[in-house]
Regions:
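Sequence-structural signature of the catalytic-core scaffold of metal-dependent phosphohydrolases
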Residues: 17-51, 63-74, 83, 94, ...
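Short terminal hydrophobic/aromatic SLiMs and anchors at protein ends
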Residues: 2-3, 14
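Short glycine- and acidic-rich boundary segments immediately preceding or forming the N-terminal edge
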Residues: 82-88
Length: 250
């Protein structure tokens, strides 16, 4: 709650507000992941002469990507649909981005009233959420969840002889969310389609903050992930930088 101020006096800032301001500053980080060999660091990369914010760049990278366009060929499951204009993953992603825009506007209204975010940083909330909404299904394989199960089944049979190799375990528990993080977080292999999102957009993207290494092969139950073993070091550094790690390290 903002304190009342007398005429001619500045508004007092409570310790709670200082903490929230610092937290938002971390959450709205414009930094991007930089991978060099085994080393993971961050850089404030901005295209020269680009008037857009780093978060608008995230949004644009998704819109103009081939992976995003391919979502038009991936349908959502609609058994016995009554109409012939059912959703595909592309139209669904556009709708999710629109919902994220709506939620972001409400968040902006609240933080603006509370004074939790510097005025010049408030727009970052909207763009990072829209970018995450637009890209949230970009890692989905063909046939969606059925495709995930097919990959898991193939890896379980094919990789059985390789034992506990972490990469094979990634395939055994394959999840489109983790594949999306892989595509959106990395900056290496320039000839590949890596988007190198800002940390703020990556934080908005993650729905299930669990790692593939925490699931044993063949374990029962739903296995929704944030990152594969190949991106575990990246995920941990991003999560720590955003201040999303609990006191117990989880």
């Amino acid at each position: 709650v903002l304190t009342q101020r007398a005429p001619g006096r500045k508004c007092a800032i409570l310790p709670h507000m200082e903490k929230m301001t610092e937290r938002w500053e971390r959450l709205l980080s414009p930094l991007r992941v930089k991978v060099e060999g085994e080393a993971v660091s961050f850089e404030d990369y901005r295209p020269r002469g680009d008037a857009r914010s780093p978060f608008e760049v995230d949004y644009g990278r998704v819109v103009f990507s081939s992976a995003f366009r391919r979502l038009a060929r991936k349908t959502q499951v609609h058994p016995f649909a009554d109409v012939d204009y059912i959703h595909n993953r592309l139209t669904h992603s556009l709708e999710v981005a629109s919902l994220c825009h709506t939620f972001a506007k409400e968040v902006q209204r609240i933080v603006r009233a509370r004074g939790d975010v510097a005025p010049e940083r408030i727009e970052a909330i909207d763009w990072s959420m829209q970018a995450a909404g637009l890209a949230h299904d970009i890692g989905n394989p063909a046939y969606g969840h059925s495709g995930e199960e097919a990959i898991q089944s193939w890896a379980e049979k094919t990789g059985a002889r390789l034992g506990d190799d972490p990469v094979w375990n990634d395939f055994r528990v394959f999840d489109g969310n983790a594949q999306a993080f892989r595509l959106l977080a990395r900056n290496d292999l320039r000839d590949s389609v890596y988007y190198c999102f800002t940390l703020a957009s990556l934080g908005a993207l993650v729905k299930h903050p669990r790692l593939a290494s925490s699931f044993a092969a063949g374990a029962p139950g739903a296995r929704k992930l944030a990152a594969f073993s190949t991106e575990e070091a990246i995920f941990r550094k991003v999560w720590d930088r955003l201040g999303l790690v609990r006191a117990d390290g989880t």
